[in-house]
Amino acid sequence: MMTSKINYYIDLKRFDYKKCLDIQYRLVSMRKNDLIGNTIIFVEHDPVYTIGRKADPRNYSNVNVIRTDRGGDITYHGPGQLVSYFIFDVRINGKKEVKTFLNNIENVYINLLKNLGYSASTGDEPGIWIEKNGKLKKVASIGMAIDDYVSYHGVALNINKEVLNGFIKINPCGLPPAVMDYIDIKRDDAIDLIIREIEKIYGKFNKIEYEGLIS
């Protein structure tokens, strides 16, 4: 949906998962009421395991989890991972186009990875995959939700080897932990590349502090 509101992105740096979820809910309400434009939250969480609506307990028998309303199964968030939450109006000409929106987000990450020299694609399983040492490896997990016509939750991109330790205790999205991998990129560089790709689809995004957005 076209809006006169300015698109923004927020960088919360290192931030608690539950507190960030509360921020998402607040921004979703604001987006539904057209008080803000499309908004992205960038964040790195303290170590945490979260489960989505399709979670299978057999995939996380040895860890404490936070239950969420996103799609998907269990995943891990922690240092070495850049999480992007997309608070977007998914309507096109007044019609809710969830599939188009999801394809757009997937293509942002596929193009980002291709620009870094990786052969990237979606696969039979959710997420973004690259070919590494002759094997397909998952470097980004996707889990979204839609409230009426506004998206929330998002994409977790592994950007440092440190994050892989968090997947050892679970079957992420029902898969063996060995499928998870990472790309070696600085956090700020990854944000810049995501913004560059998203602006090709949704127009200009300006950086803002969270307090400035809700004031």
Curated annotation (Swiss-Prot):
Q: Name one GO biological process term.
A: protein modification process
UniProt keyword Transferase, yes or no: yes
Q: Which residues form the active site?
A: 173
Q: Where does substrate bind?
A: 70-77, 141-143, 154-156
Q: Report the EC code(s) recorded for this entry.
A: 2.3.1.181
- Known role: Catalyzes the transfer of endogenously produced octanoic acid from octanoyl-acyl-carrier-protein onto the lipoyl domains of lipoate-dependent enzymes. Lipoyl-ACP can also act as a substrate although octanoyl-ACP is likely to be the physiological substrate.
Q: Which PANTHER family match?
A: LIPOYLTRANSFERASE 2, MITOCHONDRIAL-RELATED, OCTANOYLTRANSFERASE
Put simply, this protein is called Probable octanoyltransferase 1
This protein's species is Picrophilus torridus (strain ATCC 700027 / DSM 9790 / JCM 10055 / NBRC 100828 / KAW 2/3)
Its ancestry begins with:
Archaea, Methanobacteriati, Thermoplasmatota, Thermoplasmata, Thermoplasmatales
Q: Give the gene name.
A: lipB1
